[in-house]
């Protein structure tokens, strides 16, 4: 036997939510009263209001800096449109469970992106509750619970000093602006020969010893700290301290620099040799050949004493060097005995006179042609 079908009005009532139309709904307010939120209507709800109200709010990240102040920030650019989100906070199950509004907002491009809490508002060992809310959509909110002792970031260590304990041992000391027993430290050091750092963990003591050092090397040290493990379980380290150096400034050269210098010297030497060879061949082509004593006699014999033939001097230059006069030989003899005549005869030439000195040659000009 067939069951009677549902009335048409019942089917329509069941399909109304699927068609996106509203019904008369009520919700309970915190004081227990009923609050009517919508009346029965047969129109479609705006899709943009649905999408905005269902979008998740950005996550809030809080960090306590050296227990002096705390910043809670969020990514304001993740919103579909610029929105000044508001932040409320309180401490769970404590005397400070009263809801507080943020009194000091941080801004990014004139949009709220964080909140800063001062030292008096920070209670490390109480559960911190933070609530982010969209003021345009009060029901759009997100709540997080945080343990602040795990979110502490100390300041970087300060006043690094080095002491030489012995001929080959160094001790590094530093200071922190927080209780030393709450911090652990990480020391890094390297020499000017090293390409990477060597790390060494140090407990709450603020000193580190290096048992063996090389006086010919230059050492660099730096330190950072973390709020762990006695007072909290923070995972974030502080910034690195300013580095401190020890050792000779004239240490051995870096192997890489030594290899680079060797290559530069080799290439420079080869370039110099090639340049000298080029200059030598150029001079050999442009300068006249100068014979050695061994083959000078052979050259004179081969070229019949013609210097210009084998020296490379041009014919025009050789002709211009020819003299334009002729020489007459002058005979010089020894001084005659006393009483002898100075001349051999009445027509004797001065060139034939006897003189204790060398007589210059006599010249006669060639007749002009």
From Swiss-Prot:
The modification Phosphothreonine is found at residue 292. A motif (WSXWS motif) lies at residues 237-241. It is found in: Cell membrane; Cell surface. Residues 156-253 form the Fibronectin type-III domain. GO terms for molecular function: coreceptor activity; cytokine binding; cytokine receptor activity; interleukin-15 receptor activity; interleukin-2 binding. GO terms for cellular component: cell surface; cytosol; endosome; external side of plasma membrane; membrane; nucleoplasm; plasma membrane; receptor complex. Residues 23-262 are extracellular. The keyword Repeat does not apply. Gene3D superfamilies: Immunoglobulins. Glycans are attached at residues 24, 71, 75, 84, 159, 249. It is linked to Severe combined immunodeficiency X-linked T-cell-negative/B-cell-positive/NK-cell-negative: A form of severe combined immunodeficiency (SCID), a genetically and clinically heterogeneous group of rare congenital disorders characterized by impairment of both humoral and cell-mediated immunity, leukopenia, and low or absent antibody levels. Patients present in infancy recurrent, persistent infections by opportunistic organisms. The common characteristic of all types of SCID is absence of T-cell-mediated cellular immunity due to a defect in T-cell development. PANTHER family: CYTOKINE RECEPTOR (PTHR23037), INTERLEUKIN 2 RECEPTOR SUBUNIT GAMMA (PTHR23037:SF47). The WSXWS motif appears to be necessary for proper protein folding and thereby efficient intracellular transport and cell-surface receptor binding. The box 1 motif is required for JAK interaction and/or activation. This is Cytokine receptor common subunit gamma. It comes from Homo sapiens (Human). The gene is IL2RG.
